Design a protein with these regions (language model features):
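Short amphipathic alpha-helical interaction segments
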Residues: 46-62, 76-79
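A short, conserved structural fragment
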Residues: 60-71
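Short acidic, hydrophobic short linear motifs in intrinsically disordered regions
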Residues: 27-44
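Alpha-helix N-cap/helix-initiation sites
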Residues: 9-10, 29-34, 49, 53
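Short, cationic-aromatic polyanion-contact patches
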Residues: 10-13, 70-94
C-alpha cells in the first residue's frame, strides 16, 4: 500500500504569499483591515507576531512584497502593512499548481 507522504505544513514564505494574495483586494488602499498587519499575518499563517518581520524580510528583498504604513480600520494609529508586488503576484500564481497538489497534514 503506497500512500503519498503528507507534509506537515507549507513553507513560511508560501503561507505569507498566499495570505497576501487572499488579501490582494486591499492593495494600494489607504485604509485597510488588520489582516495585512503583523498581527493579522501572524494569526493567519501560524506565526508569532515578532517572527513576521523576519519571515517577510527575504521576500521583501526578492521584490515579491512591498511595505507600507497605513491606517487600519477601527484603530487610531497607523501600522506597517505589506502587499504583493506584480512580481509577487506572478510568483505565487506560478507556485499555486504545486501547492494545490500538496497533501498537507492539518493538526
Amino acid at each position: 500500500m503506497s500512500e503519498t507522504p503528507l507534509r506537515v505544513s507549507l513553507s513560511v514564505n508560501d503561507r505569507v504569499l498566499l495570505h497576501l494574495l487572499e488579501n490582494d483586494h486591499q492593495a494600494d488602499h489607504f485604509i485597510v483591515t488588520s489582516a495585512i498587519t503583523r498581527p493579522g499575518i501572524a494569526e493567519s499563517c501560524g506565526l508569532h507576531p515578532p517572527n513576521v518581520s523576519r519571515a517577510i524580510r527575504p521576500i521583501l528583498k526578492q521584490g515579491f512584497v512591498s511595505e507600507h504604513t497605513r491606517q487600519i480600520r477601527g484603530e487610531t494609529r497607523r501600522q506597517k502593512t505589506w502587499q504583493l508586488t506584480p512580481l509577487g503576484r506572478e510568483e505565487i500564481k506560478n507556485r499555486l499548481p504545486s501547492i494545490k497538489e500538496t497533501n498537507i497534514l492539518i493538526r
